Amino acid sequence: MKGDKMPKIQLCVGDLPAKVKFSKSVAVDTETMGLNLKRDRLCLVQLSDEKGNVYLVQIKKGKNCPNLKALLTNPKIIKIFHFARFDVAKIKEDLGLVVSPIYCTKIASKLCRTSSPSHSLKSLCWDLLGVELCKEQQTSDWGAEVLRGYYTMIIGFSQPMRLRY
């Protein structure tokens, strides 16, 4: 994030607002009720732009999310994930679309940092950005109407990490 200033965080219920635009890339992370692709529903899609602004899109049951879907399938915008495999599979399962193009910081780390013992997001943030991640404040009830104590800073680090590779 530029200048160490706090990002603007916007909660978007049901879909990403049509007025929100991304230029070249968007950092993406998903939160679910669990890790079973078939059983556990997608609750939240976090997006961060190149300026560090964060959009928390709460996914409501039965909602179509046309703006979010358009963003995730836009071939001109790179979607940055850390360990994209689960997120991409869950988006396909719940929203019925294939996310493309994708940049995975975990795969990039494995390719570029072959001697590193860890490729976790926490390790990457510390090694590349000098930032220590603390997920203690992260909520686990992603299906709640009101998200409490959510630590949104994590998603903001994917954009600058991509620039390091």
Positions of predicted regions on the chain:
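Short amphipathic alpha-helical surface micro-motifs
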Residues: 9-11, 25-29, 40, 61-63, ...
